[in-house]
């Protein structure tokens, strides 16, 4: 079972739908309606941290879940979830030079992890005003995708099964979103 932590974002249900279409059993819980003990009892096979309208500091149980389950359970962070992963490991989250809300842009990627077998560059949909400050991303992460402007669009932990994407693979305008999520499911 995938635990999908909902950070009060409507895109959470698009993620839910995509994962269900891929054959996954998905349990959705809001970030303030479960504790770390609840998650431990649920024993999810994978965890997805959803997008959200806030900063990682306001993402409820998300930060604690990332801290606790990193290295034990595969975790994918989407948008806010991506930022939360980076912040847990010490990166700073900063305002983007250009706000991207509902805009598509190409990202170039390494072809690893969730990007395995995807078009390169890949057209994705972005909804964010915050980004990972690249100067603060710890060495334990590799950057797996960047925008044309060089902004971090994907990260992957070098040891743990822990990955994040700044964009929304679950948006209808994102290219190969199902395949990206299938890559997370099928490893």
UniProtKB/Swiss-Prot annotation:
Catalytic activity of the protein: chorismate + L-glutamine = 4-amino-4-deoxychorismate + L-glutamate
One Pfam family cited in the UniProt record for this chain: GATase
Domain of life: Bacteria
Glutamine amidotransferase type-1 domain sequence ranges: 1-187
Keywords: Folate biosynthesis, Glutamine amidotransferase, Transferase
Gene Ontology terms: cellular component: cytosol
Gene3D superfamilies: 3.40.50.880
Active site: 79, 168, 170
SUPFAM superfamilies: Class I glutamine amidotransferase-like
EC number: 2.6.1.85
Keyword DNA repair: no
GO molecular function, one term: anthranilate synthase activity
InterPro entries: Anth_synth/Amidotransfase, Class_I_gatase-like, GATASE, TrpG/PapA_dom
Enzyme class (EC, first level): transferase
BP GO terms, sorted: folic acid biosynthetic process; L-tryptophan biosynthetic process; tetrahydrofolate biosynthetic process
Pathway: Cofactor biosynthesis; tetrahydrofolate biosynthesis; 4-aminobenzoate from chorismate: step 1/2
Cited function: Part of a heterodimeric complex that catalyzes the two-step biosynthesis of 4-amino-4-deoxychorismate (ADC), a precursor of p-aminobenzoate (PABA) and tetrahydrofolate. In the first step, a glutamine amidotransferase (PabA) generates ammonia as a substrate that, along with chorismate, is used in the second step, catalyzed by aminodeoxychorismate synthase (PabB) to produce ADC. PabA converts glutamine into glutamate only in the presence of stoichiometric amounts of PabB.
Subunit architecture: Monomer. Heterodimer consisting of two non-identical subunits: a glutamine amidotransferase subunit (PabA) and a aminodeoxychorismate synthase subunit (PabB).
The protein, known as: Aminodeoxychorismate synthase component 2
